[in-house]
Amino acid sequence: DSLFAGGPTMSICERYHWKYMIVHKEGDIPFIHQEFESLVPLTPENQLTFHTGPQGKTRQEYHWINDIAYTDSEKDKHTVGVLECVERGPDPKQPGQTKTTRFRWITNFTLKEKQVLELAYQGGRIRWKIENEGFNVQKNGGFDLEHAYTTDPVAIKVFYFLLQIAHRL
């Protein structure tokens, strides 16, 4: 599941020298949000536009900022980058309409133009892919994951483990 965007999570990752990409939802760490929003217009060189999807109808605009200094509630200092993808394309639920989706991540990777797409797809959006191709199949594809078969915590763990094996087969 996703990491919580906050200083303690970053501190743990940094202590073990782990790289991270943490979803940065609106309202999480307002200081980082404000810094990113104020620096993006000043750094037009940190922008990339990419067309994808059927007939290239989906437009992805990437913006990134490196070296944002952040001091968390525990007074630990962090230097982070922020990567954002604003995706505009056809809305599959409303034909003829455009859907805009914003993805934003906090990371300790140094963001460069050559790696932005790879980080977004392999780091940031892989969780989305796992959820859609994995958990949604388990919930809606005949595995009945949401059904409460038991209230015993051990039994439900065993059930879920067996469901994972069945899904892999």
Descriptions of predicted regions:
Residues 15-19:
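Glycine-enriched alpha-helix->loop->beta-strand junction motifs that scaffold or abut catalytic
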Residues 140-169:
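Basic, amphipathic alpha-helical segments enriched in Lys/Arg and hydrophobic/aromatic residues
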Residues 5-14:
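Short Gly/Thr/Asp-enriched flexible loops that form oxyanion-binding sites at enzyme active sites
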Residues 114-149:
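Short amphipathic alpha-helical "interface-anchor" segments enriched in bulky aromatics
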Residues 21-127:
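An anionic, glycine-rich sequence signature occurring as long contiguous blocks
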Residues 1-5, 20, 105, 130-135, ...:
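Short, conserved catalytic/metal-binding motifs centered on acidic residues
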Residues 2-6, 26-29:
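Acidic, metal-coordinating catalytic cores used for nucleic-acid/nucleotide bond scission
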